[in-house]
């Protein structure tokens, strides 16, 4: 006997019913064929490749699972992509996430849409889609940040970041906006070291139509300052500064991590401004050297 049923080109199950059956026998025959065809379809679907399996340590904390650091000296190679995107010279899937990320730049809206399925930016190694520009000296980076999916994971992170290199365990300092509204300044003081938090604040609930949260990361020598604008006010310093020394050129840029190793999510960073002549974050608004909101058009000042 051949297959009791088969999948059509449209994906439906077709049952072959022979003619001349009595009503009762025909009903039994139909039922038998239905369940046999269902088993056939299930077996075919089971053979389709699924998502890669993430190790337990890469899973976020839940009521039934404690979040833990990666194994000692665990690393994955970063995947780099040549070619500029907007203001940035290149982009990378730092830490070789199990699923590839993506990024797009819309010149009309000045928006970078960054998607990634990535375990975290924490502990001794990172995974994220990173858009970068090699720079040196004093610099500031600012951007508006939004998450298109309001129901995404609370610890997803959109970051403004300075990294010494593109390895997953690079020395780095970042300011991050989490999906649940946490904002912090954090740094990895040495390669393969644990990240330390320098300061944090909570953005609170966002009413419909609220201005996007705007963050800034400012480098002056070895001193880094977190800048924030929560409700459309001028950027201003938040929390304490942090000290970190970089050797030679570094990678400055924006990135996103879903905090879920096989689930992709998205952040949008807009009105990105890079300034190589750093203004003083602690100057009074409107004073000489004060940090100001960018013009409508995205700019780079060299």
Predicted features along the sequence, with ranges:
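Serine residues within intrinsically disordered or low-complexity segments
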Residues: 9, 22-23, 42-43
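Extracellular glycan-recognition regions
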Residues: 50-302
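N-terminal start and proteolytic maturation junction detector
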Residues: 1, 5-6, 15, 56-59
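Bacterial N-terminal signal peptides
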Residues: 33-45
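Short, positively charged and aromatic/hydrophobic N-terminal segments
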Residues: 15-16, 23
């Amino acid at each position: 006997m051949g297959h009791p049923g088969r999948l059509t080109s449209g994906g439906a199950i077709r049952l072959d019913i022979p003619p001349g059956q009595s009503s009762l026998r025909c009903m039994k025959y139909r039922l038998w064929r239905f369940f046999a065809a269902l088993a056939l379809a299930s077996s075919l679907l089971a053979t389709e490749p699924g998502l890669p399996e993430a190790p337990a340590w890469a899973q976020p904390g839940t009521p039934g699972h404690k979040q833990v650091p990666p194994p000692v000296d665990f690393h994955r190679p970063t995947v780099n992509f040549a070619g500029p995107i907007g203001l940035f010279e290149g982009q990378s899937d730092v830490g070789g996430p199990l699923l590839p990320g993506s990024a797009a730049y819309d010149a009309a809206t000045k928006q970078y849409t960054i998607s990634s399925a990535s375990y975290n930016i924490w502990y001794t190694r990172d995974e994220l889609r990173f858009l970068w520009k090699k720079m040196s000296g004093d610099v500031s980076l600012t951007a508006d940040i939004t998450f298109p999916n309001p129901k995404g994971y609370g610890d997803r992170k959109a970051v403004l970041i300075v990294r010494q290199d593109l390895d997953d365990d690079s020395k780095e300092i970042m300011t991050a906006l989490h999906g649940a509204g946490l904002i912090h300044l954090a740094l990895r003081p040495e390669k393969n070291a644990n990240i330390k938090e320098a300061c944090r604040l909570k953005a609170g609930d966002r009413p419909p139509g609220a201005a996007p949260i705007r963050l800034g990361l400012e480098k002056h020598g070895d001193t880094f300052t977190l800048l924030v604008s929560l409700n459309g006010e001028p950027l201003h310093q938040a929390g304490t500064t942090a000290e970190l020394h970089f050797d030679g050129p570094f990678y400055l840029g924006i990135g996103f991590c879903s905090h879920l190793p096989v689930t992709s999510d998205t952040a949008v960073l807009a009105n990105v401004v890079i300034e190589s002549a750093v203004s003083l974050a602690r100057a009074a608004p409107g004073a000489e050297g004060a940090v100001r909101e960018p013009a409508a058009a995205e700019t780079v000042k060299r």
